């Protein structure tokens, strides 16, 4: 007997048992990073960072740190790119990809919060939750300890909690788009760091410019004026207030508070980015180390 095919379009209500996939994805991502670190990133870092005729002294602290930073950014770039492609491949054919009203209605007579979730959309959520679960342990035992260690740890823990809550409370359609618009800009941030460590200043500058522009367009324009507008206004007439007298309003207010908090964070980090960008351009003509070296790493807390 062969393995039955996976029905990616199969719909079901979110269940707590679905979270069993999170540790599996966390272990999977750990294994993938370990293999890439050992057989790809290490070799790539030595080849790109150090000249062929330059003797690489791994005993020096600076050399080891630079390679570790390169490998961390390379891994994050790979993850965010894969997460972005996965989210887009799953959502771009859905009616709610182009019409935010369809976050809350359909298919058929389904109306939020009584909406089932396709198996492939569940995959997007479990993949993201698995990454942030893995990141909690990687931050503690694997990655370089930075000055923002505490903030990063809180960020990863809260990310897992918020992804889980939004899944159970059936905000998965909105959440998948929020994940996609945030992961997109992070790809260019990590690419800029890799380029900086490798000495490709022009590519680093271009990557950071795209990162800043995509941040502004996706997080400061599309996110508040389309996503938050929908979660604040479009959903209201769709909710059956008699059937969901308590849980409907509770979910509405709790998650809109969280989503607007995310907007505040996006604005805060944008102001920091803008100031640093202007300062670096005026002083050096290009973005320097302190913007992309790892001391600048804006957080993303998904809904």
Curated annotation (Swiss-Prot):
Name under which the protein is recorded: ASC1-like protein 2
Biological function: Mediates resistance to sphinganine-analog mycotoxins (SAMs) by restoring the sphingolipid biosynthesis. Could salvage the transport of GPI-anchored proteins from the endoplasmic reticulum to the Golgi apparatus in ceramides-depleted cells after SAM exposure.
GO biological process, one term: ceramide biosynthetic process
InterPro entries: Lag1/Lac1-like (IPR016439), TLC-dom (IPR006634)
GO (cellular component) term, any one: endoplasmic reticulum membrane
Keywords: Endoplasmic reticulum, Lipid biosynthesis, Lipid metabolism, Membrane, Transmembrane, Transmembrane helix
Spans traversing the lipid bilayer: 12-32, 77-97, 124-144, 149-169, 208-228, 253-273
Subcellular location: Endoplasmic reticulum membrane
Domain TLC: 68-282
Main location: endoplasmic reticulum
Membrane topology: Multi-pass membrane protein
Highest taxon in the source lineage: Eukaryota
Molecular function GO labels: sphingosine N-acyltransferase activity
